[in-house]
């Protein structure tokens, strides 16, 4: 089973506060706790404006990697951000979450092909939305 530690996410108020204050100890403690709890990946999501996101993720990834060897799950809705932030990781990790909207998969899949070991959580939503039933989900999975 793959377990993704999702507790370093700027959508969580205490994490957003730590990010705003650049509280490295808070981020590191969250990474240690998730490592000790058996996570397979440590998710890293800044949830800040896109103009600040790459540099914020760099800082967060550096904090995490200073206390654990677990791979990073780089988490952003922006493929532009993902295509930069993965470079800060010491080892292959996970792109979390890439949807079928627009050209998002077209942007990330070539990066994965050029960087063996990277994985992806691919969402079945596309420009028409989230599939409403199992048949539609099965139809869309062929795109991935």
Question: How should each PLM-predicted stretch be described?
Answer:
Residues 3-29, 94-100, 127-138:
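Active-site mouth loops of central-metabolism enzymes
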Residues 9-16, 36-45, 121-128:
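Gly-rich Lys/Arg/Thr-decorated short loops/hinges at beta-loop-alpha junctions or inter-strand turns
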Residues 35-36, 84-89, 107-117:
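Acidic (Asp/Glu)-rich catalytic clusters
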Residues 102-110, 130-131:
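Short, charged, surface-exposed secondary-structure boundary motifs
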């Amino acid at each position: 089973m793959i377990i993704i530690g999702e507790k370093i996410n700027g959508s969580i108020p205490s994490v957003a506060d730590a990010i705003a204050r650049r509280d490295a100890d808070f981020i590191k403690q969250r990474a240690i706790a998730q490592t000790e709890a058996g996570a397979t990946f440590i998710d890293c999501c800044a949830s800040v404006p896109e103009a600040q996101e790459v540099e914020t993720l760099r800082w967060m990834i550096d904090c995490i990697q200073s206390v654990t060897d677990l791979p990073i799950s780089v988490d952003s809705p922006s493929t532009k951000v993902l295509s930069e932030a993965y470079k800060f990781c010491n080892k292959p990790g996970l792109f979390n979450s890439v949807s079928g909207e627009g050209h998002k998969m077209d942007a990330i899949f070539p990066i994965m092909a050029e960087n063996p070991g990277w994985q992806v959580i691919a969402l079945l939503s596309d420009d028409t939305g989230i599939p409403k039933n199992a048949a539609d989900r099965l139809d869309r999975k062929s795109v991935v």
